[in-house]
């Protein structure tokens, strides 16, 4: 326990070798139960050498894009073969469902595709044709910035209403295709989105669009990043002792979704298999919620386990209130916020306790020996 600002705070300390032991390989679990979804985003540019299909219920393959004609396409010709290899995992887990995620960071084309009834229908028909051609099980839309001028993508004020209409049209076409293709029950074509909080809600009709979706993948991460003024837990479950009133966290995001009337079983909580580093950090509170000089970079968990968590130069702290770990290098003034098995188990308990629909993560190749995936799968029992 540490003393700070005259208050006793629940932050524990684990150094070097002990932190390394804490991140050790867990026992191989049984598959996750059917009532909870365990969803892996798999990136086409970073395909894992092996995938434990029996530990997953769904895979979202990233990314397809929207071309200049408003149609769903793979920009990289290698992605078709990558998707085929994911679909082959059904031989080991027949209940596995593989969706194609359309969009992503800096993905353009959504505003135009959603603009008119004609463009929406063209997009929906192309999505159905794309699924049929590749024998995939559904579409996940990752339109991260409807109605917002972020990442240089085209946007319009009417994106807010048009997104709902786009999902409605897509749902209708997917349902018609399910009927035509004799896909029933769990085999029907799925439709999901990646959702966020705060500004995302201001520019979408979350209280209306969710009726067209099978579920929503809440991006419960990136709360602190290169655009925030201070460090903080980028994937904290709750607010830290030192958090400002407006700081973001996963619980607040879930509550915002619930307040919009979205059924809790439709909410899938996302976790991050990577950390974020900040350099030149003010040393107060061991770097937590402090100003910094520059954003240092992203850190996949697999690389962190070997190079950072096990390093004598870093001290691992556990923030009990936020249910989040972080690393602090006092000499280098380097702060790293990340997820580990302990924080993921805490989120899995939260999912169970709140009756949510499961967990997803970005992205599978950033794990090490299934350490984080095992924390999810074992905790979903």
What kind of region is each of these model predictions?
Residues 2-13:
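Bacterial N-terminal signal peptides that target proteins for export
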Residues 127-157:
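Active-site groove signature of glycoside hydrolases
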Residues 297-355:
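Hydrophobic, secondary-structure "cap" segments at the distal end of domains
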Residues 12-21:
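Bacterial N-terminal signal peptides
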Residues 39, 69-81, 146-307:
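Substrate-binding surface in catalytic domains of secreted glycosidases
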Residues 30-131, 158, 167, 234, ...:
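Glycan-recognition patch characteristic of GH18 chitinases/ENGases
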Residues 59, 100, 141, 170, ...:
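Conserved, mostly hydrophobic/aromatic
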Residues 276, 339-381:
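Acidic/aromatic/glycine-rich contiguous surface patches that form carbohydrate-binding/processing clefts
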